């Protein structure tokens, strides 16, 4: 299994744990996944691709009346994952 396979697996687990309850613990796990991705040098585009794949899997099993809630939760989770990328970019730009 590759690093990206591990990342995809961990992302899927955390995302699917976040969807039903939107718990702070699952959201925190999303942040940690983003942090690990930055440390491991995963590109933001690769992370977006993983998010997209996992979201599409979830949407296939989502009843029509819940699509808006799932899309909203997915956005919240993805923003938390991307928070570390934002901090790293700001740190880089501030260091110029």
Predicted regions and their residues:
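Non-catalytic regulatory/interaction regions at protein termini and inter-domain linkers
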Residues: 1-95
